[in-house]
């Protein structure tokens, strides 16, 4: 994401990322969010909110001016939850689903992925599609990460309607 959004990444990384990456960065941010210094907690939450908004809204026509924050307490809560998952590797081992796909039931599966999703790259959806016999895979060229984006919402509704017809 930082290669596609260099300006947003630079604003974020100047103060918070530095040379930290991945888990090390998540732990650094998490400690700032859980510390007793309320001003530092607010700064970390605002910075994370702006960066994550730029990433998840990459497919939109413009970057949100100040992130998705809303009120400060919401931004702090959201950042704490996101960092809690990040420092715990999202409570799932790498490739867990693909490595255990044989244990999943055989059910109709439609995989819909935003082509401009830089949070979860379309390659992951493709790998899942190849592992699930009979699945369908659709990349929405201008779709991003958020299911609330019109193109993604419409495709999800069509897929759900299709499943309802198949199972009726």
Residue ranges and their predicted role:
Residues 93, 118-124:
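Conserved alpha/beta-hydrolase "acid-adjacent" motif
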Residues 28, 47, 81, 127, ...:
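Alpha-helical elements of Rossmann-like donor-binding domains used by nucleotide-donor carbohydrate transfer enzymes
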Residues 122-136:
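Active-site-adjacent alpha-helix of alpha/beta-hydrolase-fold enzymes
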Residues 135-168:
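Catalytic active-site module of serine/aspartate enzymes centered on a nucleophile-bearing elbow/loop
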Residues 104-105, 111-113, 117:
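Short beta-strand/loop motif that positions the catalytic acidic residue
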Residues 2-100:
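Alpha/beta-hydrolase
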Residues 102-106, 131-132:
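Short, conserved loop/helix-junction motifs that constitute active-site signature segments
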Residues 108-110, 136-137:
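Beta-sheet entry/capping signal
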């Amino acid at each position: 994401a930082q290669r596609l959004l260099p300006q947003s990444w630079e604003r974020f990384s100047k103060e918070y990322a530095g040379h930290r990456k991945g888990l090390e960065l998540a732990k650094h941010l998490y400690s700032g969010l859980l510390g007793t210094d309320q001003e530092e907690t607010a700064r970390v939450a605002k910075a994370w909110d702006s960066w994550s908004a730029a990433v998840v809204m990459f497919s939109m026509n413009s970057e949100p001016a100040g992130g998705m924050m809303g009120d400060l307490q919401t931004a702090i809560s959201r950042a704490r939850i996101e960092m809690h998952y990040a420092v715990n590797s999202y409570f799932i081992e790498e490739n867990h689903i693909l490595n255990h796909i044989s244990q999943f039931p055989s059910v109709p599966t439609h995989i819909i992925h935003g082509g401009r999703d830089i949070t979860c790259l379309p390659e992951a959806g493709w790998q899942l599609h190849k592992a699930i016999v009979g699945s369908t895979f659709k990349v929405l060229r201008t779709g991003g990460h958020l299911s609330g984006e019109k193109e993604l919402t419409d495709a999800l509704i069509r897929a759900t309607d299709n499943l309802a017809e198949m199972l009726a």
